[in-house]
Amino acid sequence: MKVVRILLLLLSAVCGLSLYAAQSDLDRLDGYVARRAEYVARKQHSIDRIKAQLRPSMTAVERLAIYDRLFEAYYTFRFDSAMVYVKRGSQLAESAHNSYFQDNFRIHQGLLLATSGYYS
């Protein structure tokens, strides 16, 4: 009988610790959610720095590399913007006859559509 009481006491202590840990994780998550605007601003600033590298005098390959970086930056951030750079990159790669970037942007498009639920 003593063993059962000890086991119940230990079990209740472990459950209490588990609930405390779960609440601590939720509090930490709430802190991250509260700082959402800061994270969005930081991400947008990073994207703006990449966009600022675009110049009219760039070669097609240089422009394609930047479109690729913009896709990567937008991929988990904004679906529509990521798709814009996939389409721009695909069109430029096709007109420049660059098979590497044609394939690369096809893969990006498939990945983007599949992860957003637009697959068939």
Model-derived features with residue positions:
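N-terminal secretory signal peptides that target proteins for export/translocation
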Residues: M1-V3
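A "functional boundary" signal
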Residues: R5-L8, G16-S120
